[in-house]
Structure formats: C-alpha cells, structure tokens
C-alpha cells in the first residue's frame, strides 16, 4: 500500500487527524477544517472581507464580504420563495459566471444537492441525466429553459447573466427574505456529478462537504496556495477540475477566482496577463491551445504554478511549456470525479523530475494499491489495476451498485504501477488496452512516440475489431496549424521506434480530436468513427 500521508509527510508539514464517520468509515483528514464549503466561505470572508473573491468576464466583481451577502440572500430566496429544503436535488445548468458560484454556495448552505449538468450536452443527453437524478428543481441559463418544460413536477428557475447587477436580483423581494441558518453538515452530500461516457452508462457520483474540504486542503498544502494567489478557470464548472480543483480550492484558500463563461485561449491568457494571475489548472488539450498563442503572450511573469490533469501530458509538451514559461513550476495531477479531483500529484517541478512521465505520489489522506485480476495486491513495479481509498473519495454512486466501490476501496479502471519511491505510472484505461493476437498494447506507449513527431498536436490510439488478430491499433491525428505530415511519414517513423505489432494499421487525420464533456479524449467516439467508416468502405 502507498500512503499519501507518509510520502508527503517527508516533504511538508501535515496537520492530519483521524476521524470516524457516522457510517463507520475511517478517514485521515486535515485538522481544523470547517464543517461545510459554506463555512469555508465564511472563514475566508472573516480573514479578508474586502479581498476580491470572484470577478467574471461580464465585469462583475465581488469581495468576500459581498459574496457572503449574495449567497445568503439567494439561499433565503430559495427557501422562502421556492420552498427548497435540505436534501432536495437541484439541477445546475449554468455557464461559468458569478451566478453559478453564488447558486452553488447557496445550495451548500441550504443542504441541497447540486446536480451539475454539462452545458455542452444536447437535450436528449440531458433528459437521461434528469431522469436518473430525480430532480425537483432546475436552475439554468435561458438557453436551456425550453428543454425542461416537459417535466411537469420540475420547478424551473432560469436566468441570463449580463453586465451589471446579478440577475438573481430580479427575483421578487429577494432583499426582503429573512436570512436562514445553515442547514448543511460535514457528511452531507452537496454535489452529484456525472462521469463521462454515454448517458446510459454515466454514473452519478455523490460528493460530500468533507470530500470537497479535504480535496481543497490537500491542493492548498501541495501547491502552497495562499489568499495572495489567484486563478482563472479555463475549464467548465460542470467538470470536477473547474468545480473542485479551482473554484472550491480558492474559496477555501481565500484567493481570487476569475470566471469565464466560455473558453478562448487568448482570452484566458489576457486575463492572466492583465490580472496577474498566479495559478492555473487545466487539461492537456487546454495547454495545447494555449501554446498556440505563445507568440502573443511571450511573458507571463505572474504565473508561478501550473497543474495538469484529465489525461496524461506528453514530455514534449511539458518541455515546450517550460521553454515558454521557465520561471513557472509544472505539476501533473491524476484524479477523477470520484476522488473530488486530486488523487496523485507530482511533488516536484516536472521539468526537473526523473519521474516527469509519472502522475506523482498519492495526496495526503489517500491510500493506493495495485491489484491483479483476482484482487491480490501487487508489489512495486508490477502492473495491475489501480485502487484508491481515503478522505476525498466519493460517498458512492447514486442509485447504482456497480461493484467498483467496496469496503471504501474504489476500482479506478486504470492500469498502472508504483515505483519503490511511491510514484504512480498510469499506463492506460483497462478498457482501452489493445489485445492484438494475444500481445497487449497500451495506447499511451504508441501515443508517446507519435508526439515525438514534429507537427502532431494531438493523437489518439484505439483498438478496433480485426478478423485475424481480434483487435488492431488505429490512430487519429490532429496536426498543428499550417503543418503537413503524411500517414506514410508517420508510419515510417513509428517503424524505427516500435515493435511491428504496435504500429497502427490505419492512420486518419482530423481537424479536432473528439473530446468528452469532461475534456478528455473521447476514445469511444473515435473507435466508433473508425468502425463505421470501415463498414461504409465494405458496402
């Protein structure tokens, strides 16, 4: 077993305590945490009431004192005007604006469960999630209001954020409502988020106050975040990175959050430049797009720390980012919705680490192990499925017993190994391992070599059915702007670097690699593209 408290305890002071929860679950968490995320907001407001808490891309600015006032007003309105109560399931389908942040914190105060819905989904996809989540209320942007009219028992509140005052102020008598006492508690669920995948297979992940608080405290300790830090949120707030690793972390730490409704690389970089932003956390795809704007923003001296999660970051891209921002530390992160974001973090600056290609070591309060197909724990260097247990692991899946989470140990579905020093190397999703005639291929091995070829911006390798070998690897490639590379040139390069059976039998090009709503490469969709096109060719 690999214990985060031991591995990080050698590097930084860790004020950890052991707690037993009401369900008998034992966790190791940080001392003196507030009871709820709303309590974290109050603590930050008490320390720095006049500090900027949120500024959004509509020009609206809220200090911590003002943010508490707005959250209290909206929570009171939801209770008195809409009869909302603790435990109610409330859909949130808002873009990344001040309204989203205030609504989320108001729901935490009430003790309601925020069911965060992806704004990139289509109506049919949202329908499947709404039916599974047992929603009683929906708070949405007016762009989506009509989608919910067919649900007769669903109370709908819609808004369109705009320049000027909060749209919540248009609600009747919001100023006249009596302030309510906080209803939420440490162990209460606060969020339901859906895993990526097809809507029929998406799992509703239930996260509690203590999950969010531990995740925030761990990030703060590992990245040395203080109230002097600031972050722009370059990813949607319906993703766990946006909601926990950025919004939750900075409310907890008392820093400043810059919220954008939509991602545009130049807009994010201009915000960093003009607002002197110090921290950013994003997926590899975001960093790829930011690198394309390098020439417009050659120096960003305020940035001190970058984190990258969602999927593996290639060595070549890390080196490019270091060339661009040599003063800035870069840390890889491995986690998932079920871990409330953080699972492992590379403790040292990636460019200086001999473990640059790893995902780091377990965060304080988490324990990891590697097991074989029979559940037997494996030793360092042996490859198997990654399992994790600890304080920021979800309460469970909503209305689903998947068998993935038993005795507080979660099967991640990822294949990898640990070194003797406790560094985690994630090799592939278990379901994405390619079996070509009995020879196992990890897609990451092939992708890493593809990224060595100049001009390749993004690459995805998947397995598709083959009459003789069972499966064969194929590759989808996205080239950099104004670059031309042929499939023949790519194949010739791979022949020099890889065993013959690992070389993709087919290479296709695309203008944009398909992504899931959570910002990860959508290998299921890519596999479907190859299979369907192959069927068309045989007709």
What are these model-derived regions, one by one?
Residues 280, 390, 396, 415-502, ...:
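AMP-binding/adenylate-forming catalytic core of the ANL superfamily
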Residues 49-50, 176-194, 200-201, 224-230:
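Conserved pre-ATP/AMP-binding loop-to-beta segment of ANL
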